């Protein structure tokens, strides 16, 4: 979900993999911009009205950001965060879908994907609060954790109308682990309505590939998980699928000499510290790939491996010990792998 850049073309310095191009059409265009604190890039066949397409893409992404942002005061997320317990907030189908996927993955990952940890994200300096100069106290963490938990969040549907509510005051949600995937799927539907059938969408650490031609595919390079010299770790081919990568080695800071990752374990209230540093997930939708990667990374290697096998997930896990990388690839991921 973070740090993705296009190899030899345009580097997005906050992602984990690079897109290479196989059977690249000579007449193609690349549109790019900013959204959700990261970069987006869309590659499509040449169209004469490319300015219209670019403006349309940016407008739709701006709409998504207004929907999902924790920073914008009038976003649905911000409106929910201001609710008192048991108050209903009317939501649209798009918001209903993203919350439904979050609830689904939460149940399958022992609660590791938890969108109700907005307060935890804030006290660790990855939300709308500044990075702390001291570790949050145990009492502070316990106090904030009392305001988390997907069990305190409810979706309600009635006569084609959707609502969301919380059953405790002070709970805040944060959808940063799902926003890029959601936006990529949204752009896919937008391009389809414009009659565009072949495209590659990159938003942060998420890539979505659609190809009508039966033979062609895109080659994706999963980057070696290091914040130093960028190099290719694995190559895969992708067609009509999405891949999302989460990692601990880019979005972090040091506090009293210790590395603080942006990935917070909702069960402990603490940033993850284990040696699983990168997780890539391939799925039919970008939203699900984006949700699974962070949850699996928070789980740690052993539990993530067991879960990937149990759920038949296409997963690549990379661990690091003493500056040595080790890679585990699930059986479902192997069919995408390019042997080099």
Curated annotation (Swiss-Prot):
- Kindly list the positions annotated as binding Mg(2+): 177, 290, 293-294
Where, in this chain's numbering, is FAD bound?
36, 71, 112-114, 174, 180, 264
Q: Does the keyword Acetylation apply?
A: no
Cofactor(s) needed, names only, are: Mg(2+)
Report whether Lipoprotein shows up as a keyword of the record: yes
Q: How does it sit in the membrane?
A: Lipid-anchor
Q: Which UniProt keywords apply?
A: Cell inner membrane, Cell membrane, FAD, Flavoprotein, Lipoprotein, Magnesium, Membrane, Metal-binding, Signal, Transferase
Q: Which InterPro entries match?
A: ApbE, ApbE-like_sf
- Cellular compartments per GO CC: plasma membrane
The residues the entry assigns to the signal sequence are 1-22
Q: Which GO terms describe its molecular function?
A: metal ion binding; transferase activity
Q: Which reaction does it catalyse?
A: L-threonyl-[protein] + FAD = FMN-L-threonyl-[protein] + AMP + H(+)
Query: What Gene3D superfamilies does the entry give?
Result: ApbE-like domains
Q: Name one Pfam family in it.
A: ApbE
**EC code:** 2.7.1.180
Per UniProt, the enzyme's principal EC class comes to transferase
Its primary localisation, in coarse terms, equals membrane
Q: Which domain of life is it from?
A: Bacteria
Function, please? Answer: Flavin transferase that catalyzes the transfer of the FMN moiety of FAD and its covalent binding to the hydroxyl group of a threonine residue in a target flavoprotein such as NqrB and NqrC, two subunits of the NQR complex.
Family, per the entry?
Belongs to the ApbE family.
Q: What's the protein here called?
A: FAD:protein FMN transferase
Q: Which organism is it from?
A: Buchnera aphidicola subsp. Schizaphis graminum (strain Sg)
Quick one: which gene encodes this? apbE
